[in-house]
Amino acid sequence: YLFCKFLFLNIYRTILLYYRNIFWIIMGQLLNGQWTKSSVITSDKSGAFVRKESQFRNWISKEQNFRPESNRYHLYVSYACPWAHRVLIMRELKDLKEHISVDVVHPDMMENGWSFNSDFENANGDTLYNKKYLYEIYQLCSDKISTKVTVPILWDKKTKQIVNNESSEILRIFNSSFNDITNNYNDFY
């Protein structure tokens, strides 16, 4: 048992390091609405990684512009992203499958970032707008947007805006904001 646990943790750590390094090296970004194939690595003077705060930090609640409604929201994820994966798990636990639709991007992030290429068995393309790349979803928000293009994305189909792209916040949104719709009041957060 201990050996299996040790082996699993080392494999997991290796995958995360590989993923993180590749992700930050090859991932482009949107600058003033244009896809730029540049490194998005940011660091301070000492060389330590500095994460830029997300622009999309909205909440879904009865008191906000983004109200809890069935079939109003859509999730963009990659099975290659552990942060997106945990959001999918919460969606399942909170019985949101019938209320929040999902598109899965191709797991390989190439020079144009995440794609909706459907040659991966579980990638289903962009079912809302038929876009080719995930950055085009971000461009729908603003033609002058400057941001990294990440998953998961919680998308509002009604306003055509990104509600949130921080997995920890999407988890909390899913944990409580749709309770009255699903009648699932279990607290998983």
Show the residue positions of the predicted features.
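GST-like domain detector, emphasizing the conserved glutathione-binding G-site
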Residues: 23-189
